[in-house]
Structures are given as structure tokens and as C-alpha cells.
UniProtKB/Swiss-Prot annotation:
Keywords recorded for this protein, A-Z: Cytoplasm, Cytoskeleton, GTP-binding, Magnesium, Metal-binding, Microtubule, Nucleotide-binding
Protein name in UniProt: Tubulin beta chain
Cell location: Cytoplasm, Cytoskeleton
Predominant localisation class: cytoplasm
Residues annotated for GTP binding in this entry: Q11, E69, S138, G142, T143, G144, N204, N226
Superkingdom to which the source organism belongs: Eukaryota
Chain sites annotated for binding Mg(2+): E69
Gene3D superfamilies linked to this entry: Helix hairpin bin (1.10.287.600), Tubulin/FtsZ, C-terminal domain (3.30.1330.20), Tubulin/FtsZ, GTPase domain (3.40.50.1440)
CC per GO annotation: cytoplasm; microtubule
Cross-referenced CDD domains: beta_tubulin (cd02187)
Length: 439
């Protein structure tokens, strides 16, 4: 089977990751101890992608849990699904990274990385035909950002031909945890551009907006945000976990979604987004799902797709839905909003349908877009970075761990290059496209 090894690093990465395992265990009929209690053969047909079948019919996640301090790990162990994970796959330090990217990447993280890679290799060896890795982490902290990107480069070194996909939580000024987030995020994006194959950008600001506006929550906590992220992760990985045709592995998804290797940062969305407790009172049609899914208010990334253009889009519908309805609705969206799709990639919207609906819903749709409007998000981080870096504010925390100012300048210019690449393709017409293809 085409296995995927899941790595979660840092506090945010571990919390989001655990929610993901809770969600997909529910969908595959796996209980909290790893026993199968489901009812459908489809649940087991591709279970080996994410789970290893151990002795006595216990299903164990192919997950490695990493942190530079023991607190989050203890919380995971004591949580509802703590017994699901293999005890040897918890790898943690004692010192923490103190929200410092340099500690995660160069000092504390570098000391722990060999033990992490040993576990990763062991998981890879127990795979039959490994397709790749997925990482959940945040870009604003020390461990998820610094050590997460160190892990990324080590995996790229050891497994050069496997796919690496990241679910990266991007910091936002409205929901700020630390003042040095713009530094940590810019240094991380510098690494993601070079080493990741696919990055789903999840944005705390957008998640909070969804909680307030759509779900009508007065005081959303991280639990609510992580629930939203797990909906998207479950939707995005549906094609990998259940029998289906389109985008059935990480590489096919990448081939459909990434026209230029550096532009692999995706916006994700989900429909229906409904307040908890109201799902029983409403059924949705395919057209409502499609409209919601393309609505910027449903995007988990704080950028407005109407301000840019879509290079490519993938949509995953779930539930008892006719393929014909889906195709009709999707082509309607495209013809109504034709100016939002670049015309030089002819069939740039791909659709998949999976019979198995997510738990508690009759049908759902997950949206993945490669849109040039994501430059808003990079621009926001880059502007904050520049303001601080010009004054060299807080730099001593990084140089004290052995980093060089040069590395900051390189990360800044890589970010600026990325912005201008997105802008170039946003403005491009069919005539220009012929030039790209010639180059």
C-alpha cells in the first residue's frame, strides 16, 4: 500500500495533529485503543495508508510526535486517543525552544533530530511502498517552525524522491502569540519554498473569523480552531484514504495543482461550515456546497481569492452525490467567474467524489486552491519582518544561537522573489504563457 508517515512537531503541530487522528479514526471506525469497530469495507480498504496493522488486529497510526519540551506530549498521552500512538514514537526534549526559530533549527532541535530520524527511518522500513510524509506545525514558534523545517530538510536529504506535504499554521497579527512571529515565519517560508512539495497554509486569523462570523462562537478557543483545521485535513486526505479516482496520492495531487515548483502554497476551504448543534436542521444541495466552498469567508487562509487569480483548483465532494451534479455546478462556477481563473491552463479545475461522508454530515466539500492572492498573506508577514529587521530588533536572540544576519537577508529576498513570481503569473495572459513555455 502507498503509506504516508505523519509527523507533528511543536505544541500547535501536536494539537492539530491529534485532532486529525481523532477525526480520521472516527471515519475509519477505529476506536481509542486502535481496534476496528466500523461497519463498511471501504473503511478498511486503504487503512494501511495511515495505519499500521499490529498484532492482535490493533491499528497504530504511522505518526511521529515531536516536541522540545515534555508538556504537550504528556497532554497527548493523557488525552482521549493517547493509547492509540506507539509509545516509542514520542520524541521530546526537556528545554523548549522559547519561540526562537534558531533554537529549534540550530541548537536544541539539532540535538534531538537524530533520535527523530531514527524513528522516521523505522516507520519507513515498516512501510511496503512509502509515498511520502505529511507534517503539521506552526510557522510562528520555535519548535514547529525551526525544528519542523530542520526535519523537512533532513527528510528531503534521506528520502529525496518521496513527497513531502505540510499543513502549516501561519501567524496573524490579530491572534499573535509572540512578537518575533514574523521572523520565525519568514525563516520557515524560506525553507518551505525549497524543501516542501505541497504546503497547505492555515491561518489563525481566518479561523477566528469563521468562528465569530459563521459559527457564531463568542469566545472561540484553540479547540474550536483545531476542529476546523481537522475538517480541512480530513477533506484533503479523503482521496488518499478511501477508494477513488482523482488525486489518489500525494504525487497526483501535486501534478494537478503545481504549475511551477516554487508556487506550491495552497489555500484550503470547507463547506458546509455550520454552528455546532445546527447540522441536524439543514440539508445542503450540491449548488449550495459549491457556492460556499468558493466563498472567501469559507477559506481557512486570510486572503481574498477575488483579488487574485486561480492557477489551479481541486475540489473533493463527499457523500451520496451524483457526479453529474458536481460537474454541472463546477463548470457553472467557472463560467460565472471566468476572470478569476488563468486562461493559460485550460482544464485547471479538478473534482473528486467520495461516497463516504464525514462523521455527522450528509455531504461536504473541501476546496484546495493555488491562487495568486496568497501573496497577501506573504506580504503581510514580509512587511512585519522588514519593520523589525530594519531596526535589528530582537536579532540578538537569534545571533546568540549562532545565526548570521545574512540568513535573515536571504530569507527576506526569497520571500520578495516569491511575491513577484505570484504577481507575474497573476498578470500573465495567453500570449505571455507561450513565452513561459518556451523559456
Amino acid at each position: 500500500m502507498r503509506e504516508i508517515i505523519h509527523l507533528q512537531t511543536g505544541q500547535c503541530g501536536n494539537q492539530v495533529g491529534c485532532k486529525f487522528w481523532e477525526t480520521i479514526s472516527g471515519e475509519h471506525g477505529i476506536d481509542q485503543t486502535g481496534r476496528y469497530v466500523g461497519t463498511s469495507d471501504n473503511q478498511l480498504e486503504r487503512i494501511n495508508v495511515y495505519y499500521n496493522e499490529a498484532s492482535s488486529k490493533k491499528y497504530v497510526p504511522r505518526a511521529v510526535l515531536i516536541d522540545l519540551e515534555p508538556g504537550t506530549m504528556d497532554a497527548v498521552r493523557q488525552g482521549p486517543f493517547g493509547e492509540l500512538f506507539r509509545p516509542d514514537n514520542f520524541v521530546f526534549g526537556q528545554s523548549g525552544a522559547g519561540n526562537n526559530w534558531a533554537k529549534g533549527h540550530y541548537t536544541e532541535g539539532a540535538e534531538l533530530i537524530d533520535s527523530v530520524m531514527d524513528v522516521v527511518r523505522k516507520e519507513a522500513e515498516s512501510s511496503d511502498c512509502l509515498q511520502g510524509f505529511q507534517i503539521t506545525h506552526s510557522l510562528g514558534g520555535g519548535t514547529g517552525a525551526g525544528m519542523g523545517t530542520l526535519l523537512l530538510s533532513k527528510i528531503r536529504e534521506d528520502f529525496p524522491d518521496r513527497m513531502i506535504c505540510t499543513f502549516s499554521v501561519v501567524p496573524s497579527p490579530k491572534v499573535s502569540d509572540t512578537v518575533v512571529e514574523p521572523y520565525n515565519a519568514t525563516l520557515s517560508i524560506h525553507q518551505l519554498v525549497e524543501n516542501a512539495d505541497e504546503t497547505f497554509c492555515i491561518d489563525n486569523e481566518a479561523l477566528y473569523d469563521i468562528c465569530f462570523r459563521t459559527l457564531k462562537l463568542n469566545n472561540p478557543g484553540y479547540g474550536d480552531l483545531n476542529h476546523l483545521v481537522s475538517l480541512v485535513m480530513s477533506g484533503v486526505t479523503t482521496c488518499l484514504r478511501f477508494p477513488g479516482q482523482l488525486n489518489a496520492d500525494l504525487r497526483k495531487l501535486a501534478v494537478n495543482m503545481i504549475p511551477f515548483p516554487r508556487l506550491h502554497f495552497f489555500v484550503a476551504g470547507f463547506a458546509p461550515l455550520i454552528a455546532i448543534g445546527t447540522q441536524k436542521f439543514k440539508t445542503y444541495s450540491v449548488s449550495e456546497l459549491t457556492q460556499q466552498m468558493f466563498d472567501s469567508k469559507n477559506m481557512m487562509t486570510a486572503c481574498d481569492p477575488r483579488k487574485g487569480r486561480y492557477l489551479t483548483v481541486a475540489a473533493m465532494f463527499r457523500g451520496k452525490i451524483s457526479m453529474k451534479d458536481v460537474d454541472e455546478q463546477m463548470s457553472m462556477v467557472q463560467s460565472k467567474n471566468s476572470s478569476l481563473f488563468v486562461e493559460w491552463i485550460p482544464s485547471n479545475v479538478k473534482t473528486a467524489v467520495c461516497d463516504i461522508a464525514p462523521t455527522g454530515l450528509e455531504m461536504s466539500a473541501t476546496f484546495v486552491g493555488n491562487t495568486t492572492s496568497i501573496q497577501e498573506l506573504f506580504k503581510r508577514i514580509s512587511d512585519q519582518f522588514t519593520v523589525m529587521f530594519r531596526r535589528k530588533a530582537f536579532l540578538h536572540w537569534y545571533t546568540g544561537e549562532g545565526m548570521d544576519e545574512m540568513e535573515f537577508s536571504e530569507a527576506e529576498s526569497n520571500m520578495n522573489d516569491l511575491l513577484s513570481e505570484y504577481q507575474q503569473y497573476q498578470d500573465a495572459t495567453i500570449e505571455d504563457a507561450e513565452e513561459f513555455l518556451v523559456n
